[in-house]
C-alpha cells in the first residue's frame, strides 16, 4: 500500500508541475501577443507620421479655414511651401474683398493680413493685432467627414468535412497542444521537461515481492497468455526448412533410388512426451474432422509414476514440427477410448476404465474434465472401450459401450444421465462383453460389435428388433478391432467389415453372410487393430504385436500385404488410424510412442476403376469360398 501511495503522490506532483508549466506557458504567450500588438500599433503610427512641413501645412489650412479663408487664393502650397511671387518690397498679402466682407460681418474687427516669412521652412502667421490692429474673433466651422470603406476581397479555401464530436475542454486543449504548431519553447522550460523525462526513465522499476510474483504467476490471465505464447514459440522453433533444396532436380536425381524404395510407406513424424507418454500404452487414436492436422491419443496408467494421473489424453499437431503436445488432458482413471466430438471442435470425449465418460474442453485452462458421467448403475460400471459421436450437425448423440454389455446414448450438453440405454444380450444368454464397435457410413441405428468371446454381432439401437440381431462366428480369440467399409464410390460396399483378433488373423465379413468371406493369415502374433481406408475401396491396414504395420490392397493380392513396415524396436502396435485424406496413417505402440507414416500415392489414391475391380475381387472370393464349402461337404460323407 505504501508503494501505491508513493506512486500516487509522485503522480500528483507531476500533475501540479505540468499545470505550473502550462500556466507559465500561457502567461508568456499572452505577453508575446501583447508585445506584437504594441509593435503593430507603433508601426501604424510611424507610417501615419509625416514630416513637420506637412503638419504645419495642415495646421495652416485648418487655421485659415477657421478664419474664413479658403485655399482657392493664389497661394500655392508646393512641396517646399514656396509662397506666390511678390514684389521685393512687399512683405504681406492682403485680400481687400475678404477684409471688407469680414468688416461687414463684424464692425469692430479690422481687416486681417496674412504675412509669410521668407524662410520656406518656417511659416509664421501674423494677425493685425501684431501689427497694431484689433484682435481677431474666431468662429466655429462645420467639418464634413466622409469614410470610404475598404474594398472587400473574397477568398476561398478547400477544407475536409469531418464530424464534430463534443469533448471536454481539457481534452480539446490537450489535442490543440498536440495538433497545433507549438510556439518556440524557452530554453528553461525545455530543460525542465527533459530533466523530468530523464528522471522518469532513469527511475528504477518497482521490484515485485515474492508474494506478488506468485500472485501473477497463478493468475488466470497470465496462465492463458503463457500457454498461448509458448505454443506459438514452440511452433516457430520447431520448423525445419531445407534452404539448400535444388528445384532443378539434382537433389531428386541423387535420391531417386531412396524415393522409389520408400514410396509405399515412409516415416513422417514421431510423437512422444517424456512425462506424459513414457511407460504408458496408447489405447486409442482419433483424427479431428474440423482440424485434420490434430490427432488425439489416449493412454492408460503409468505404473512407475503412482502420483501422476492414471488417465491421459494428448492432442498432437501434424501441421507444425513441434515435439510437445498441443493440449494435455488427464483424469483419475485410465482412458481406454477417446474421440473428438464430431460437431464440436473444442470438445474431446474419453471413456475410462472405471466406467465414467469424461469431457474435456480446450477453451478451458483446466486439464481436468469439464463434465463427467456419474458412477452409478444407470450408466456404465465396466471399462468403456468404445465412444463415438453419430448423427448430423443438428441431431447427434454420443454412443458409448462397455464390457458389461450396456450401450448408452448421451447428449453432450448433459452427461448427468443417459438419454437412452440398452443391454446387449444374445438369445436370453448373458450380456455380451463388447470390446470394439463400428457404425456403417451414414447409419446411426445399425452397428456391429466384437466381443471377448471371439464372436461378432450386428445390432440396432431403435425399432422392434432393438438389440442383438445376428451373430457371426469365425475367430478363435477375443476381437481386438472392427471396422465397417468407409470408402464411398460408384458401388455400395457398406455391408462389408473387417475384424482383427488374438488368433493372429484378420477376417473380411459381410452382413449378408454369417461366415467370414476371407481370412488373412500372414501375421505371426496377436493382431491388435484393423481399419479400412476412407478413400480406397480395397485397401485396409492392420497392426500386430511384433511391431509390424501391413497395408492390404485386395485388388492386387489377397495372400500377402501390398506394403509392410516394422517400427524401430519392434514394440507391440495397439492402434492404427488413417487420416481423413487417406494419405497418412498413424500407429500407437505399447511404449507410448505414436508414429506417422506417409502412404505412397500409388497405394493411397484409388483409380477410377478400383470399385469395379473390387467387385470382381469379391466375386472371386465368394466363388472360392463356395468351392471350398462344397469340397468340405463332399469330404464329410467319405
From Swiss-Prot:
UniProt xrefs under SUPFAM superfamilies: WD40 repeat-like (SSF50978)
InterPro entries in UniProt: DYNC1I1/DYNC1I2, Dynein_IC, WD40/YVTN_repeat-like_dom_sf, WD40_repeat_dom_sf, WD40_rpt
| PTM sites of type Diphosphoserine | 51
Domain of life where this protein originates: Eukaryota
CC terms in the record's Gene Ontology section:
centrosome; cytoplasmic dynein complex; dynein complex; microtubule; outer dynein arm; vesicle
- Predominantly, its location class is cytoplasm
User: What residue ranges carry the coiled-coil annotation?
Assistant: none
Tell me the residues on which N-acetylserine occurs. 2
Query: What Gene3D superfamilies does the record point to?
Result: YVTN repeat-like/Quinoprotein amine dehydrogenase
Identify the stretch(es) annotated as Disordered: 1-135, 154-209
User: Which Pfam families has this protein been placed in?
Assistant: Dynein_IC2, WD40
Function, in words: Acts as one of several non-catalytic accessory components of the cytoplasmic dynein 1 complex that are thought to be involved in linking dynein to cargos and to adapter proteins that regulate dynein function. Cytoplasmic dynein 1 acts as a motor for the intracellular retrograde motility of vesicles and organelles along microtubules. The intermediate chains mediate the binding of dynein to dynactin via its 150 kDa component (p150-glued) DCTN1. Involved in membrane-transport, such as Golgi apparatus, late endosomes and lysosomes.
What is the annotated quaternary arrangement, including any partners?
A: Homodimer. The cytoplasmic dynein 1 complex consists of two catalytic heavy chains (HCs) and a number of non-catalytic subunits presented by intermediate chains (ICs), light intermediate chains (LICs) and light chains (LCs); the composition seems to vary in respect to the IC, LIC and LC composition. The heavy chain homodimer serves as a scaffold for the probable homodimeric assembly of the respective non-catalytic subunits. The ICs and LICs bind directly to the HC dimer and the LCs assemble on the IC dimer. Interacts with DYNLT3. Interacts with DYNLT1.
Protein name, as recorded: Cytoplasmic dynein 1 intermediate chain 2
Per the UniProt record, the source organism is Rattus norvegicus
Amino acid at each position: 500500500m505504501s508503494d501505491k501511495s508513493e506512486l500516487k503522490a509522485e503522480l500528483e506532483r507531476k500533475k501540479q508541475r505540468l499545470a505550473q508549466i502550462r500556466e507559465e506557458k500561457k502567461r508568456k504567450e499572452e505577453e508575446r501577443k501583447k508585445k506584437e500588438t504594441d509593435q503593430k500599433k507603433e508601426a501604424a503610427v510611424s507610417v501615419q507620421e509625416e514630416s513637420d512641413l506637412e503638419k504645419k501645412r495642415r495646421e495652416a489650412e485648418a487655421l485659415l479655414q477657421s478664419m474664413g479663408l479658403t485655399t482657392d487664393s493664389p497661394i500655392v502650397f508646393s512641396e517646399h511651401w514656396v509662397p506666390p511671387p511678390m514684389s521685393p518690397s512687399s512683405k504681406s498679402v492682403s485680400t481687400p474683398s475678404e477684409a471688407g466682407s469680414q468688416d461687414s460681418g463684424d464692425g469692430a474687427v479690422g481687416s486681417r493680413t496674412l504675412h509669410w516669412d521668407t524662410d520656406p521652412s518656417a511659416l509664421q502667421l501674423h494677425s493685425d493685432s501684431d501689427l497694431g490692429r484689433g484682435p481677431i474673433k474666431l468662429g466655429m466651422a462645420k467639418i464634413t467627414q466622409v469614410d470610404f470603406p475598404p474594398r472587400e476581397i473574397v477568398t476561398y479555401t478547400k477544407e475536409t468535412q469531418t464530424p464534430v464530436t463534443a469533448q471536454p475542454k481539457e481534452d480539446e486543449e490537450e489535442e490543440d497542444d498536440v495538433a497545433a504548431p507549438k510556439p518556440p519553447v524557452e530554453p528553461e522550460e525545455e530543460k525542465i521537461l527533459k530533466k523530468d523525462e530523464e528522471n522518469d526513465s532513469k527511475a528504477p522499476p518497482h521490484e515485485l515481492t515474492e508474494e506478488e510474483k506468485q500472485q501473477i504467476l497463478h493468475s488466470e490471465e497470465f496462465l492463458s497468455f503463457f500457454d498461448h505464447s509458448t505454443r506459438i514459440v514452440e511452433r516457430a522453433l520447431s520448423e525445419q526448412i531445407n534452404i539448400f533444396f535444388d528445384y532443378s532436380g539434382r537433389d531428386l536425381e541423387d535420391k531417386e533410388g531412396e524415393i522409389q524404395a520408400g514410396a509405399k510407406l515412409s516415416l513422417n513424424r514421431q510423437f512422444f512426451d517424456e512425462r506424459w507418454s513414457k511407460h504408458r500404452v496408447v489405447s486409442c487414436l482419433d483424427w479431428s474432422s474440423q482440424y485434420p492436422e490434430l490427432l488425439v491419443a489416449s493412454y492408460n496408467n503409468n505404473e512407475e509414476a503412482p502420483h501422476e494421473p492414471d488417465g491421459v489424453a494428448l492432442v498432437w499437431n501434424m501441421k507444425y514440427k513441434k515435439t510437445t503436445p498441443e493440449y494435455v488432458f488427464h483424469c483419475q482413471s485410465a482412458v481406454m477410448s477417446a474421440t473428438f466430438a464430431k460437431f464440436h471442435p473444442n470438445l474431446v470425449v474419453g471413456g475410462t476404465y472405471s466406467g465414467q465418460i469424461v469431457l474435456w474442453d480446450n477453451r478451458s485452462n483446466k486439464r481436468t474434465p469439464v463434465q463427467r458421467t456419474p458412477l452409478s448403475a444407470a450408466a456404465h460400471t465396466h471399462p468403456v472401450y468404445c465412444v463415438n459421436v453419430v448423427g448430423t450437425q443438428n441431431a447427434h448423440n454420443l454412443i458409448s459401450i462397455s464390457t458389461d454389455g450396456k450401450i448408452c446414448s448421451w447428449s453432450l450438453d448433459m452427461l448427468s444421465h443417459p438419454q437412452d440405454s440398452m443391454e446387449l444380450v444374445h438369445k436370453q444368454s448373458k450380456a455380451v462383453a463388447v470390446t470394439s464397435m463400428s457404425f456403417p457410413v451414414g447409419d446411426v441405428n445399425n452397428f456391429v460389435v466384437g466381443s471377448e468371446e471371439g464372436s461378432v454381432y450386428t445390432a440396432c439401437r431403435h425399432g422392434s428388433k432393438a438389440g442383438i440381431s445376428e451373430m457371426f462366428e469365425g475367430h478363435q480369440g477375443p476381437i481386438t478391432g472392427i471396422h465397417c467399409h468407409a470408402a464411398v464410390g460408384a458401388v455400395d460396399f457398406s455391408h462389408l467389415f473387417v475384424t482383427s483378433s488374438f488368433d493372429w488373423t484378420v477376417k473380411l465379413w459381410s452382413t449378408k453372410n454369417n461366415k467370414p468371406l476371407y481370412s488373412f493369415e500372414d501375421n505371426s502374433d496377436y493382431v491388435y487393430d484393423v481399419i479400412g481406408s476412407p478413400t480406397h475401396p480395397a485397401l485396409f491396414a492392420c497392426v500386430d504385436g511384433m511391431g509390424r504395420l501391413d497395408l492390404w490392397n485386395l485388388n492386387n493380392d489377397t495372400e500377402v500385404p501390398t506394403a509392410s513396415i516394422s517400427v524401430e524396436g519392434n514394440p507391440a502396435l495397439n492402434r492404427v488410424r488413417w487420416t481423413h485424406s487417406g494419405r497418412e496413417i498413424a500407429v500407437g505402440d505399447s511404449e507410448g510412442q505414436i508414429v506417422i507414416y506417409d502412404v505412397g500415392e500409388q497405394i493411397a489414391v484409388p483409380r477410377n476403376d478400383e470399385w469395379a475391380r473390387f467387385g470382381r475381387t469379391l466375386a472371386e472370393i465368394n466363388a472360392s469360398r463356395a468351392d471350398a464349402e462344397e469340397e468340405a461337404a463332399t469330404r464329410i460323407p467319405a
